[in-house]
Each structure stands twice: as structure tokens, then as C-alpha cells.
Amino acid sequence: MSENCGPTDAHADHDDSHGGMGCAEVIAEVWTLLDGECTPETRERLRRHLEACPGCLRHYGLEERIKALIGTKCRGDRAPEGLRERLRLEIRRTTIIRGGP
């Protein structure tokens, strides 16, 4: 396994697997980990992968900083009701697509 594997490197299309997960799968699940929305099993698999994959760990760190920045800049602001409703609908639609029939 390359020390530099991860989503931003030339071989990001490989399914580099650390901790039982490929880089693409880890990148797709980063926000569920940051938001505390993944299962304990998925959290452990993500943790193992991030410990072994510097590229994905860098990506995780970037997303973590973005989340913190958004949290500090948007504190107390409330989205307009129309936007909130559109987001709710999109989340439901995405959940249905990911969850399947």
C-alpha cells in the first residue's frame, strides 16, 4: 500500500483498502463520521482506515476544518424556511436512494 494513497493522488481510482474499507468508500462516509451519524462498526472501520492511510487522513482533516469553520461562521443564523424544507426533501430523497428498496 502506498504511503500517499488517498483521494487527491494520481491513483485515487484504485480501491486502496485499509481497515477493510477502500479510499472512495471512506471519502463518501467522512461526513457521517464528522456528524456522529455512522454506526459504531462503521466508525471503527473508518478509524482503522484513517490511521493507515495518510491521504484519507489529510482529506478527513480538511473536512473537519471546513465543518469547524462553518460552525463558527454560521452560529446563530437560521436558514429560511423554504431552504430548510428543500434540504429536508433532498435528504429524504438521498436516504431513499442510498437505502434502496
From Swiss-Prot:
Residues 9-15, 28-34, 38-44 are annotated as: Inhibits SigH sigma factor activity. Induction: By SigH, part of the sigH-rshA operon. Keywords: Iron, Iron-sulfur, Metal-binding, Phosphoprotein, Stress response, Transcription, Transcription regulation. Binds 1 iron-sulfur cluster per subunit. As the iron-sulfur cluster is unstable, it is not clear from the contradictory experimental evidence whether it is 2Fe-2S, 4Fe-4S or something intermediate. Nor is it clear which other residues besides Cys-53 and Cys-56 are involved in metal binding. GO terms for biological process: response to heat; response to oxidative stress. It comes from the Bacteria. Iron-sulfur cluster binds at C23, H49, C53, C56. Its cofactor is iron-sulfur cluster. Phosphorylated, probably by PknB. Phosphorylation decreases interaction with SigH, leading to increased SigH-mediated transcription. InterPro entries: Anit_sigma_mycothiol_RsrA, Znf_put. GO terms for molecular function: iron-sulfur cluster binding; metal ion binding; sigma factor antagonist activity. The modification Phosphothreonine is found at T94. An redox-regulated anti-sigma factor for extracytoplasmic function (ECF) sigma factor SigH. ECF sigma factors are held in an inactive form by a cognate anti-sigma factor. RshA and some peptides derived from it inhibit the sigma factor activity of SigH. Probably releases SigH during oxidative stress. Belongs to the zinc-associated anti-sigma factor (ZAS) superfamily. Interacts (affinity=15 nM) 1:1 with cognate sigma factor SigH under reducing conditions; the complex is disrupted under oxiding conditions or as temperatures rise. Binding inhibits the interaction of SigH with the RNA polymerase catalytic core. This is Anti-sigma factor RshA.
